Swiss-Prot record:
SMART domains: IG (SM00409). The keyword Signal applies. Residues 139-160 are annotated as: Disordered. It comes from Equine herpesvirus 2 (strain 86/87) (EHV-2). Keywords: Signal. This is Uncharacterized gene E2 protein. The gene is E2. InterPro entries: Ig-like_dom_sf, Ig-like_fold, Ig_sub. Residues 143-160 have a biased composition (Polar residues). Residues 1-18 form the signal peptide. The keyword Signal applies.
Length: 307
């Protein structure tokens, strides 16, 4: 049984208080051919400049990564005053380009605005490079696509967060989130298969018992007090919950629920389900130090479970 305390938020009326970014989980390209890497953003303050960088992450390092000069950009498309897409391009993809990449967006905020959880956000993707047919025939048919040390046997798609998908789906960006007491805390769930112009609703639940979940908005001790919903861009978007002062009470199991609402009487407003859920875990530790949140981004879900 799910204890509902729903607070439905319309994308058309929401106002983001913190910058955020999202990307497909996997981007596939072919050796020797051009590739475009798209990084969507929302929550931009129109009165302040925004910076976007594409970095290749460093294996085993908490440092975010290094710039790859061959990737040019970003060129901004589909831009409004607060959201849009930055596109990075490379003319000829190399096998060495395979790996995990970070898109970091940052914007200076007013330090007096305590509602802003962060002035930067990092989204991640895995670039898979497929060998050309000629090279594959020379090296043998046993070779598999290269995705870098963090990914193996990835499919030739852009993952569950692709604008090519027509079915509405939801996925938590991180299955395990670990931060220190007193640090900022943010969690994200992405959705795909959405129709632009329709209302999107998002609710975050915390597990309070066996099979029972309660809306975080009704839990007075929760630090996740701010919800930022992005607009739909190329069929995808993101819900970001955040807070500025994590406590031990924030630890636990969570479920995010995102739905797409059709106006009454329109196609899609019947019994078909246009909502999705995913689950993740938050751990708040007492060890002092810098915010652990961004460092956790550098691990895959399976690696996080081992920590």
């Amino acid at each position: 049984m799910i204890i509902l305390g729903l607070v439905l938020v319309s994308l058309l009326a929401s106002t983001a208080s913190a910058i955020q970014a999202w990307m497909p989980q996997v981007i596939t390209g072919h050796e020797g051919r051009p590739l475009s890497v798209r990084c969507h953003y929302a929550g931009k303050n129109p009165s302040k400049p925004m910076t976007m960088m594409l970095l290749k992450t460093i294996e085993g390092s908490a440092f975010r990564g290094t710039i790859v000069p061959r990737f040019k950009g970003p060129v901004y498309t589909k831009s409004s005053c607060s959201s849009g897409t930055g596109v990075f391009t490379v003319d000829s993809l190399h096998m060495a380009d395979a790996g995990r990449y970070a898109c970091m967006v940052s914007q200076e905020n007013d330090p007096k605005d305590e509602s802003v959880c962060s002035d930067y956000h990092t989204a991640y993707t895995n670039i898979v490079v497929l060998e050309t047919r000629r090279r594959r025939s020379l090296l043998g048919p046993q070779l598999t696509p290269t995705a870098g040390p963090r990914s193996t046997q990835l499919s030739q798609t852009t993952g569950p967060l692709s604008s090519q998908e027509s079915e509405f789906s939801v996925v938590a960006v991180r299955k395990g989130v670990k931060v220190y007491v007193g640090s900022s805390l943010h969690v994200e769930c992405q959705f795909s298969g959405a129709t632009a112009g329709l209302n999107i609703s998002a609710v975050l639940f915390k597990k309070v018992g066996e099979g029972a979940y309660q809306a975080v908005s009704t839990i007075s001790t929760s630090s996740l007090t701010t919800l930022d919903l992005s607009p739909v861009i190329e069929g995808t978007g993101q819900a970001k919950w955040c807070g500025v002062n994590a406590t031990k009470e924030d630890s636990g199991e969570y479920m995010c629920m995102i739905g797409m609402d059709f106006p009454e009487g329109e196609e899609g407003s019947g019994d078909e389900d246009f909502s999705g859920v995913d689950f993740f875990k938050i751990t708040v530790v007492t060890e002092p130090g810098e915010d652990a949140d961004e460092d956790d981004y550098l691990y895959t879900s399976s690696e996080e479970e081992k920590k």
